[in-house]
Amino acid sequence: MEPANDTTVTEFILTGLSQTREVQLVLFVIFLSFYLFILPVNILIICTIRLDSHLSSPMYFLLANLAFLDIWYSSITAPKMLVDFFVERKIISFGGCIAQLFFLHFVGASEMFLLTVMAFDRYAAICRPLHYATIMNRRLCCILVALSWTGGFVHSIIQVALIVRLPFCGPNELDNYFCDITQVVRIACANTFLEEMVMIFSSGLISVVCFIALLMSYAFLLTMLKKHSSSGESTSRAISTCYSHITIVVLMFGPSIYIYARPFDSFSLDKVVSVFHTVIFPLLNPIIYTLRNKEVKAAMRKLVNRYIFCKEK
């Protein structure tokens, strides 16, 4: 997508997370460790669910899709951020900025919708166990996942369409380590009140509505489970799982609401919240959603033994 004709800015300067060399090196080691955990673990999750016939239920199909989105979500900002720790002048082209913005909102919104679908899956499994296979059949799962991706795509197109029509004539400095609408809109050479309101309505509304829907669904599930708390270990595990999922929901939607559901003014906490939103959240997803699952862990060990250590068991 090309900028408007009156656009003179061809690149943006990113301020990064810190200007201190020692701090940059520490952050590089930390974020590289996170990224090198996120990529192989999520790839292993996808391969395990794909290759193990015992993990064919809708829940695991949704987990594989979540792992795929996490790979892309973490890869939108992390590689450039890691390279920029060693670059004096951190720049990104106008086209690169628009691409980063597009994929950030595409994958991020898709993940929000997918988390909502996963909450519905948990509701069906816990509250309608006898009808679960009928309700959450493979066809419905594919439709819900496709709708999640489509919703994310439409949302992202709206953000990009609003940005590319704005004129940029300087300054061109973005006070962050990646491109996002909250920084880009602030440096446009025009009155952006209408665009800002549409973006807040779009991004903020998605975040708030999904967040409230998820909290209500998990509150309902916890109420149902605690009524049957005498059922034994399986109920205790389900309650623990719900609390873990609520943690992810808060960590995902809290920063998103803070960033997008308010006027796009600059605050001192913006960069810290952005780190939680783009780095910490993809790190915790596989830990809480998948690696606490005994069936998945057993299947992963089996897969590693078979294909890496060449052992059948």
UniProtKB/Swiss-Prot annotation:
Glycans are attached at N5. Changing R186D: Reduced affinity for Asprosin. Keywords: Cell membrane, Disulfide bond, G-protein coupled receptor, Glycoprotein, Membrane, Olfaction, Receptor, Sensory transduction, Transducer, Transmembrane, Transmembrane helix. Disruption phenotype: Compared to wild-type mice, mutant mice fed on a regular diet show a remarkable decrease in body weight, food intake, fat mass and plasma lipids. Blunted response to Asprosin, including attenuated cAMP levels and hepatic glucose production, as well as improved insulin sensitivity. Mutant mice show significantly reduced food intake in overnight-fasted mice compared with wild-type mice. Male mice display decreased fertility caused by impaired sperm motility. One of its GO terms (molecular function) is olfactory receptor activity. Olfactory receptor that acts as a receptor of Asprosin hormone at the surface of hepatocytes to promote hepatocyte glucose release. Also binds Asprosin in the arcuate nucleus of the hypothalamus, thereby stimulating appetite by promoting orexigenic AgRP neuronal activity. In testis, Asprosin-binding promotes sperm progressive motility and enhances male fertility. The activity of this receptor is mediated by G proteins which activate adenylyl cyclase, resulting in an elevation of intracellular cAMP. This is Olfactory receptor 4M1. It comes from Mus musculus (Mouse). The gene is Or4m1.
